[in-house]
Amino acid sequence: MIVVPVKEGENIEKALKKFKRKFEKTGVVKELRARQQFDKPSVLNRLKRERAIYVQKLQQVEE
């Protein structure tokens, strides 16, 4: 359960923004979307490998 303490006199939009930020960090929506369809393990492994290669290339460019 996400708890966002609201200080007295604090704007409700600011509190809502804090809530949204905390909610995004939990990854609930991302996991829900991932569970809507089944992906074969071989496809997941391939995507994971491709992402690792992409990240490696980005790190090499930075250096």
Curated annotation (Swiss-Prot):
The keyword RNA-binding does not apply. It comes from the Bacteria. GO terms for biological process: translation. The keyword Transport does not apply. GO terms for cellular component: ribonucleoprotein complex; ribosome. One of its GO terms (molecular function) is structural constituent of ribosome. Keywords: Ribonucleoprotein, Ribosomal protein. NCBIfam families: S21p. Belongs to the bacterial ribosomal protein bS21 family. This is Small ribosomal subunit protein bS21. It comes from Phocaeicola vulgatus (strain ATCC 8482 / DSM 1447 / JCM 5826 / CCUG 4940 / NBRC 14291 / NCTC 11154) (Bacteroides vulgatus). The gene is rpsU.
